[in-house]
């Protein structure tokens, strides 16, 4: 048959139509009028489409071997137009096979221009949706060839056009992925053997340096949407003119098409590429950009899988250089916030893995085998930052879980002696806890300060390591500060006007009130011991940290912190404590600063005047380190009413305050009187702290303050889980705000006996002014005691002089409600009346089955 087709009249019609699209002149292009005839014939005769494709391929191969590029381009253009016109033809799969054979021949020519032509044709083919699938089509050759083109270099046959060849290879790989993922019968594109070629080819072009010779810069890559391919040839647009830009889009599209089961096949080549090309070396900007692109491209619910794969890779690289591990941890820190709440299912698993790596790094550093300790510390900081960013992406309740989990990993808090490695691990884990705590926003104290968590923090605040104690105070600052006041209180000075500090103050909630009533004893005793343990080498930081904690608790617990301040003053005066004069002066200054702050917050003029008087006396005495007015403008130093004779009564060479210098000390009675004048209950202000720690001798080293169980002076102490005793709720006068004072304690009062007669005050509340007058009335304990004695005497005289039956009859006549039977009858009547009123206007209640009267039948 082929022999009969040598002359034109003997050729079949489809061959004559194909031949007619070629021009007579070699330089002319495709004859579009004849191409339209060929297209119409192919659509009208779909059974001829396969033969048309075979003939076009035969002519293209012949022209390619004879080096006729114009005729080759005509054949390729004709094939592309037929593909687009006959996309719904039943013979399209057979025609597509001929088209792919033509593309393969062009790619095998090793001609840069022909490869460009083949790539464009293949991209056109990849955008066509076939109605019937092909069961035997394979793309192995195209993956190999396009991957090879992605690695083109100037030394190869491409010369200066190597960037064009790389772009063509990337477009070809994108076409292969698109064509494979849209065909359900070809899921093998996600096999590891194919991903090991596609992914490195994309990353190789993504890491290409810019024209200036600098390294990777993500700022040069524009943002793309999630669409994979346009209906037209999108490779001609300007934003894909360079391999770097095109490879970034290819990576995002590849990850966007990957299902959950295919993610591992894509992530593993990425990790391998980073290892081989040393892309983890700090700063890992390229690795961060790649994994951010991956996280943004995949489905949000699968983001945790990428985090888990990175952690698993960090497990496998535990023996690698510190720089590599630092890079992986930095990448984790950069992308974990993007994952958001999708990491919830593996929350504790991921956080436990990070903590395990942190402990392993600490053990390795302390083992003596670490050759680069600064790099190992950088690795630990990177892990801590990763855990902080990890916590920042979680909801608040999971942040609390993470803090509890971190606290549970802190070793040897209950032992008197711990190993050096454990102390260092405590330091690292407390820094981790501080990092997580900075991401948490406290709403209610009881929510975050659970019993176990608070007990652990109280123990951490008193450990041997001063850095751990300081970090624990910073944790308290972060969790107690709900109005961003800590930044203004961390280095609080002596302020003549506290409004200059710009604090935000509001009333305490009921929940926080109950929390502070329960735990104020433990917290104040911890603060007292923390001051005693303050390191002499870093004294100001520790004292300022305790002062900041006290200031943050000022609103929640006013009276108890005044009591603590007086105890701290007594501690500084105690000669048994082997403190330096500088430390004693720092404690005195801290007490003065706190009393000045709290006195102005509660707006108590007399208390403010007392504080200013003492501070002014100290400034005039000239004791080094006690003059708080040096850096204060408009100080009242020169106007102090203190006489010169009083100043000269003590020695001028003193370096600190002694108990004889009463004019330089704060007096508890004066403070109590000022508080009573403002309506505060200052009863517990005179209850001192017990400084004798189980009878231990104070040797001045500060160790007597560690690992001791405090003996609280409460009559209603209760044992806490950590060994502390909390003061009874009814015994603590805790002011929940500057405008509120709790009622007087009723404990150990005769009003609690069985003979008590509760007489509420008779309020003739005819006007609002009367109510205000009663509410603002000053509480006088002497007058209350006198009334209580009169009430007790009247009760005793009535018991002694009146018969029991007579007293019973008198009480029944005065108060009918004391008769139980009458009270019950009265309640039943009132309930019946309320029921009848409620049922007015309502439909009648349906009758019971046994109340229905059935009709009688006559037989």
UniProtKB/Swiss-Prot annotation:
Gene Ontology CC, one term: plasma membrane
GO BP field: protein localization to plasma membrane
Biased composition (Polar residues): 696-714
Pfam families for the chain: EFR3_ARM
InterPro entries: ARM-type_fold, EFR3-like_ARM, EFR3_Homologs
Residues covered by region (Disordered): 696-728
Top-level division of the source organism's lineage: Eukaryota
Signal peptide: none
Family the entry assigns: Belongs to the EFR3 family.
Family matches, as PANTHER family: PROTEIN EFR3 HOMOLOG CMP44E
Full protein name: Protein EFR3 homolog
Organism from which the protein derives: Caenorhabditis elegans
Lineage: Eukaryota, Metazoa, Ecdysozoa, Nematoda, Chromadorea
